[in-house]
Amino acid sequence: MFCEKPTEKREKSPCRCKNCVLRHSDFLPWPEPIGFTSDRKTDKDNNNHISTLQSVESVVTISDVNERHTTNHYKNHQSNPDEIAYTPNRSGVSSPVNDGASSPTQRGGTTPAPQGGKGGNSPSRVTAQPQAQPTILLIVVNKNDPPPYGQGQSWEYPGQQYSVPGPRGYPGPGPRGYPGPGPRGYPGRGPRGYPGPGPRGYPGQGPRRYSCPGPRGYPGPGSSGRPDPGGGLQGYYYPPSGPGNGTGPSGRPRPQNENEYAYYDRRRYSEAYQNNRNDWRGQPRGYYDGAYAEEHNLNRQPETRRNCQCPEKQQTPPPEETQNAQENDDQQTTKRKSFKRLVGMGVGNTCSCQGPSLMGSNLRSLGNEMDNQEVGRSGNMGTPPNTMEYLSERGSPPEIREVTVTDAKNKTYKCIQVPICISTGKANTCRCCKCAPSPDAENDESFDEDAECICNHEGKCTCVAGNEFPTEFGCECDLTNLEQTLRELIPNAECICYLKKKKRRRKRKKWAPKVYYDRFAGPPFVLNPKPRCLDYGRSPFCNPCYNPCSCAPFAKSCYTCDYNCEGCGRF
């Protein structure tokens, strides 16, 4: 039987994993990747915030230890030429170095030489050098605009050059101690404390609010904020007008609506505005809530008239002036004043009259004619015409119209203007008043005891004889105060809301003392108020007290009836 040759056992390659258990201590671990090393270093720096930088002594100590470790490594592994040596460095990343070859740092790379091998007999000493870190190059480009008055030219003295430019590209000081231009193209200060040019080459504001000369011979803004020709307000820089009509400072076209945004109102120079109320500059202003504004910027609203009267189409001719008529006029004036006092002046906005105001004119003319007829007749008793019939002859009353009224609190009311008898309903449902017999005996034949009467415009009954009474009679209600006020207010729309809310009667609970219970007693009993035993007559506890106070008929407490006698002796 043939024996097979024993298989040669392959030599296990030494494990160089850093955390492997089978790795011998003599074998150095594999180097970690550069990116992973930098991440670990970053984590380590984040964990140790206090010690961020290593001192010089620690660096020297680490370098000495690395040199000693490298020397020992070459002494131990000199017999094995194929073994790769690893040189630690300060950065914590070890780079592989072949024996007898130049170091990777000297070649500029981190990988061993491909032809490394048995080139040399004695290893050369490799110095530990820090690995090159990546460099981030940040380039900042500053674009310097050209100065507004020429490169190197002085603003005050054109033609004279400035001195040598300053460091880092900044302009140096001007000649004779004058300040140079500002940094990065901005204009500097002017000479002798005067301000320099403004932005974009326009003149700045002078000292003590005096104007500075504008560029190219144009005048600058005036002093104290008043605009000079071509200037503007204080604190603002107005560019001068261009050479041509309709162009701006740089030859740009002006906007078409530029006149709308002008500072002053050109209409104030017209003759139509001379008689108006102007301010100290002669410029009309609109006043609104204590502040004023320009008239062309604020739409002026008409002034609110509190008691406006709607225009009447037909005005009755005034009656003949008599003494009684003057008295009636005085009475009507007094009534109007009282009604205005009732309505309240100064409350509410303007009224908007809708529809014709025939009703108010008819009622006023009707009242005047009735007064004249009463005055013309003998005595105070007159026969006024029927109101409904009179209105039917003159024309049907206008339709009901609504007028919206807003008071000072912006609360809106709708006042409905209607004819009389609004409180009782229609006119034919009103009850007519009866007249008493006439005191004059001469007029007994012509006077009817069953004579009826109507109410005049003042709400008073006026007796009418039977013969003179109209055949078709429609009764008219007695005017209440509300109806008189409404009649006087028609067509004036400033009304008062007479509708009052009904007050709900508040039901008052009967007073009873608050009851406190002893909830922990069994059964719970009342603590306050204490229950009283109305025990009238002789008390059963009189004899032991020998005190007549307990024998009186009074309310006693069931709990303290034994102690109702103060200071009484007991057996």
Curated annotation (Swiss-Prot):
Amino acid composition bias (Gly residues), ranges on this chain: 217-234
Region (Disordered): 71-128, 142-258, 298-336
Bias type Polar residues, positions: 88-113
Superkingdom, natural source: Eukaryota
Compositional bias of kind Low complexity: 205-215, 311-326
Compositionally biased spans, kind Pro residues: 168-184
Name of this protein: Uncharacterized protein CG42266
Organism: Drosophila melanogaster
